[in-house]
Amino acid sequence: MTNNKIIVALDVPDTESAIALIDKLESVTFWKVGLELFTSSGPRILEVLKSRQKRIFLDLKFHDIPNTVAGACRGAARYGVDLMTIHATSGRDALKAAKEAVEEGAAQAGVKPSKLIAVTVLTSISARQLALDLKIPVELPEYALDMALMAQEVGLDGAVCSPQEVAQLRQICGDDFVLVCPGVRPTWAEAKDQKRSLTPSQAIQAGADYLVIGRPITAAAEPELAWKRIAQELTTVA
């Protein structure tokens, strides 16, 4: 059984732990490499995944001034990963510079350009936190849409959003805009620090292209069984 809509999060502290998990979940074809693992392992983990013909979501969420994010994206694009992320709150100029840099880096390395997607609002952020802590005076769904539209306007390939915003983004941004949803939780898994979650089938029905799922699979007593259980759930989605 395979399901190319599921991206499993390699949220482990080192290369050895990552390899053990990859070997345990042989059926998984798409893996997310985030800050913790990349800081520890560096490009080596990308080489490991490439050697096993796996797809890669490099989720480093770049967030800096335009020149800096451009340099980071140019370098990351040379690895030939499938997806990479930048915070939409870096601003319009940074998003545009990053997109151009991805094209440049891929051309220099002779690889296919990565799809660059913008993080709209972290799934750990609630509407209350957006208003009270971040002092953003708009409703959370509206803010997520604004960030996605800005990214689309400057040429980015898609956005990361919570499952609760995905239907609105799909309707307004169109079918060609890639939507990636973390914060997805099966009914049998704990929500933990995800504030705006849906089940995998609900998120796909709402319009998500990819689901990022970590602990419900990787922390399960039987990770392969948990993955197959979710993949089976998605086969019922029209």
Swiss-Prot record:
Stored CDD domains: OMP_decarboxylase_like
What keywords sit in the KW lines?
Decarboxylase, Lyase, Pyrimidine biosynthesis
The record's Gene Ontology cellular component field reads:
cytosol
Tell me the leader sequence span: none
Instruction: Write out the pathway annotation from the protein's UniProt entry.
Output: Pyrimidine metabolism; UMP biosynthesis via de novo pathway; UMP from orotate: step 2/2
Q: Which SUPFAM superfamilies match?
A: Ribulose-phoshate binding barrel
Q: Where does substrate bind?
A: 11, 32, 59-68, 123, 185, 194, 214-215
Biological process (GO) annotations held by this record are: 'de novo' pyrimidine nucleobase biosynthetic process; 'de novo' UMP biosynthetic process
Which transformation does this protein catalyse, written as a reaction?
Answer: orotidine 5'-phosphate + H(+) = UMP + CO2
Please indicate if the UniProt record lists Lyase as a keyword: yes
Which residues participate directly in catalysis?
61 (proton donor)
* EC number assigned by the record: 4.1.1.23
Metal-binding among the record's keywords?
no
Q: Which NCBIfam families match?
A: PRK00230.1, pyrF
- Complexes and interactors: Homodimer.
Role summary: Catalyzes the decarboxylation of orotidine 5'-monophosphate (OMP) to uridine 5'-monophosphate (UMP).
| Annotated family | Belongs to the OMP decarboxylase family. Type 1 subfamily.
The record ties this protein, via HAMAP family, to: OMPdecase_type1_B
In terms of PANTHER family, this protein maps to:
OROTIDINE 5'-PHOSPHATE DECARBOXYLASE
Protein name stated in the entry: Orotidine 5'-phosphate decarboxylase
